[in-house]
Amino acid sequence: LESHLHESTPLGGECPVTFKITHVGLVAPNGIEPYEGIKYDLPFDSYPGLCGALIVLAGRNPMILGIHTAGNGRKGAACLLDRASVKISKELVIAETTEMPKMVMGKQFEINDHVHSHNAIHWVPNDEDVTLECIGEHNLATGTFSSDIIESPLCERLETIGIVRNHAGPERSAVKMARHKDLININRVRPPLNPLILKWAVDDIKTKLGNFMTATPQFKEHVHLLSFEDALNGVAGVKGFDPININTSMGFPLNQPKISFLKQSELSDKLGSPTMKYIREINNEDGTITYAYDIVFDADKMDIEQELNDLMAMAAEHKRPNLIFRANLKDEALSFEKIAKGKIRVFAGAPVTLVIATRMITLALINAMTYFPTVFESAVGVDAAGRDWDRLYTYITKFSHCCAGDFKAFDKVMPAGISEASFSVLKYLLAESGIPQDFLNVFDTLATEISHPIYEVDGLLYRACGSTPSGHPLTVVKNGIDNAISMRYAYYAAHYRHEQKDYDPKRGVIPLFHQVVALMTYGDDNVMSVDVAKEPLFHQLSIAQELGEIGQTYTSAAKGEHVSKYTDAEELDFLKRSFKPHPV
């Protein structure tokens, strides 16, 4: 230990300290209140990164007393851990970090410490405050981007009547700039969350959903696990149980469409020629014939079922399989203005094993949630061309004053704390519905993979510290929960600021969020109404202010700044649609 005392490098291992019970008062950006804890003298200078170290009572019966939370010089402080604290932490378990695999989906590769000089990571300015864990560069071939966007033959005719073309495909020259900007935006250091306010936000939404689960016990009957076959094929004729998209990629490192790894269907054998229709006939007892999807991976090309079993076994032990999300450039028509700025959107595709495992555990739950949009505050599954739209309007105008908004780069810059909180809500619903513990463990690990993702960018592998991949199978559902938690965070943060930190929702100083706000989300879009008689602090301007404090940018539906507290109901815009009552 003595040899380390004068070094600047972080200490590893353990060291003895003496301590006494005290009230620890911290002055921090989070505004943490004084709490019961311990103070002690360190045999070395405290350093950034020491927070989280365990304080253990040594002896014949050793026990964990607390966690190091603050230090100044050789003075340290820690919070005490009790049974209640440990119980709370078990709501979502972060999986254990493991070594990077050398083979994925039958493809072997090496990871080198040296990263090519042209890679975007070398072009991050020194003054940019970014944080990421650079894993290295793999030795597999990388793809090149080319756009398939072409000019319509109608453009010339349209110009004769005054309609001028204002869109085109992305420029290839913008590829490096797009990857560079995306790398910086994802990994830029953002302000910390206040864990107390986040807990209030999560408790609020769980209270609402818990009351619903108690009042609607039949909901649990519709939440169940799916078999491997049903996760691939869905259930024909049942809303929400669609088959897996066979035209999308298998993910890294295969990077080829799923259809390339499928067996030909029974229909193909019957016709005697290949077909894109992966279906099979079912001869029923009454003599009728029905059809079902018949998506089967060819084990000779890729044994996906075995790959999935290996993933599930590892995930059940809370060990990370280190799934890799490949960053791809989106080939879409862009306005000339965006082309001039060198903009190309980047999305991250998920590996097929993650997609299947997630569908097996969550698809039935997600489908059941779509039947209760106002309970789960999500418009996923809502028919915008039918009666659902009228019911939605009635709900979101429940109170007198309305708000609406959007986020800038929502999931890519999602704080890991909110992401983990959203997964804890989903896990709560799964657990309450009777999903076995082994599969809840798998869900924990999948949540860890998504909340703390590993990205592949043009050969570079790195782990992000505050981002959610845009191509994972729970994207729209999880984004909606992220949205709902963010709104609650802004709500409680506004009161926490106004009440000069004396506010505690358990004392009933103000109503719970869902009692005074009627919120509806779809991904990063939201629209709501507020009971201003009971809730004067929560509005568009306060939302933007409070979320800005944690690095989120809350904008108007048109992506501009909010200039007023509320929006008239007649001017509400949601999912690029307005609400106009039928004249009849």
Task: For every predicted segment, state its role.
Residues 34-41:
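Short Pro/Gly-enriched beta-strand edge/turn motifs at strand-loop
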Residues 6, 60, 70-72, 409:
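Conserved beta-strand elements of beta-rich interaction domains across eukaryotes
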Residues 25, 89-584:
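Viral RNA-dependent RNA polymerase
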Residues 1-18:
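Short glycine/Trp-rich loop-beta-loop segment that forms part of the substrate-binding cleft
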Residues 1, 72-75:
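Catalytic-histidine neighborhood of serine endopeptidases
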Residues 74-83:
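A short, polar/charged loop-to-alpha-helix boundary motif
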Residues 43-69:
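Catalytic nucleophile loop of clan PA
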Residues 24-29, 52, 70-72:
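Terminal interaction modules at protein C-ends
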